[in-house]
Regions:
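Long amphipathic alpha-helical repeat/alpha-solenoid cores
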Residues: 1-339
Length: 339
């Protein structure tokens, strides 16, 4: 088993769990996985997750599942990814689990291609929840009038969300609706996904973090309604962005909260380079302080360069270097906290 990428310690531990007389005993199963196209990294992941697969009867247990996966158009290229992500597909009961789960997914998604796409994103735990929770949660969404296309997109992009415990799922749905989201609108699915993927403790930590900037609950909620995905960022990322935009650039926290889309951009790759250029232009009096946060960060690179770098290159030839982070404000004799 050492040859499949496992450390000697892991190989020894798994051998002990399986009561192997020799680490070489499951070589036929390892060779089988390699023949399917799995890399050593993928095989080691499979072995760690489902070590008993190594002792499964290939002919009676594994090959029927493999035949089923191929029958639903899981290509040879897709098999390694599908199996490494979810090795349970090769050991769960075909009649009692895999086929019923497939039928549930197929009834919603209609195409095998979308079912395979969904299977790639399901963990072993999620796969176990398809029959238990999936159908009930779909009924909740359909009962709210959520469009079929939106449900399909949610399932294919984040199937684990719809596999959540039924009570947990329903509670979060009610909470999202209470925040003002309409199930018919696309933002509802994004908000539900973020809320279900964030633990109550983490959610509270993020809300408390915004409150420390002086933002009210209504302001935070408005930001979430405008751009739900910003709450999926880590608290550290959110606080770093707020610190730069408020303390370095001088924007009010409420202004940042009214434009939550700015959290979609990288601090190092977009926000700091662009804001550095803007700060130089402001300090030199070449642009007005009324310039909006959105116009700075959401415009394309080409437009930004034309409006703020090329336009002023004769008066400030160093702007290109500032934009490319080859030169900082200090090199020009400025600081972010200047006004």
């Amino acid at each position: 088993m050492n040859s499949c990428g496992l450390s000697p310690e892991s190989a020894k531990s798994i051998s002990k769990k399986l009561r192997l007389k020799s680490p070489k005993e499951p070589d036929s199963s390892l060779s089988f996985l390699r023949d399917l196209g799995l890399t050593d990294t993928q095989i080691s992941k499979v072995v760690r997750r489902r070590p008993r697969l190594l002792l499964s009867d290939l002919k009676k247990i594994v090959l029927p599942k493999l035949a089923f996966l191929r029958s639903i158009m899981v290509s040879c290229n897709d098999l390694p990814e599908v199996i490494s992500r979810n090795p349970d597909l090769l050991v769960r009961s075909l009649d009692q689990h895999l086929i019923p789960s497939y039928n549930i997914l197929k009834s919603l998604l209609l195409s095998d291609e979308k079912v395979v796409k969904t299977l790639k994103r399901l963990s072993p735990i999620d796969l176990c929840s398809v029959q238990k929770n999936f159908a009930c949660n779909l009924l909740v969404l359909r009962g709210l009038g959520m469009p079929q296309s939106a449900i399909c997109h949610l399932v294919t992009s984040n199937p684990k969300v719809v596999c959540k415990n039924v009570d947990n799922f329903s509670g979060n749905v009610k909470e999202i609706i209470g925040m003002g989201f309409n199930p018919v609108k696309s933002a509802f699915a994004f908000a539900l996904k973020v809320k279900l993927q964030t633990s109550p403790i983490t959610w509270k930590v993020k809300i408390d973090g915004f409150r420390r900037w002086g933002l009210s609950e209504d302001e935070i909620l408005l930001a979430f309604r405008k751009y739900p995905s910003f709450m999926s960022l880590s608290e550290k990322t959110i606080m770093k962005n707020m610190d730069f935009l408020v303390n370095k650039m001088g924007w009010q926290p409420a202004v940042v909260a009214r434009n939550p889309i700015v959290f979609a951009y990288s601090l190092e790759k977009r926000i700091v380079p662009r804001c550095s250029v803007i700060k130089v232009l402001l300090l030199k009096g070449l642009i007005k302080e009324t310039i909006s946060l959105l116009s700075i960060l959401t415009t394309s690179d080409k437009s930004f360069l034309e409006l703020f770098v090329i336009k002023h290159k004769e008066r400030v030839p160093q702007l290109s270097d500032v934009f490319e982070m080859k030169m900082g404000l200090v090199d020009l004799g400025f600081a972010f906290n200047e006004k």
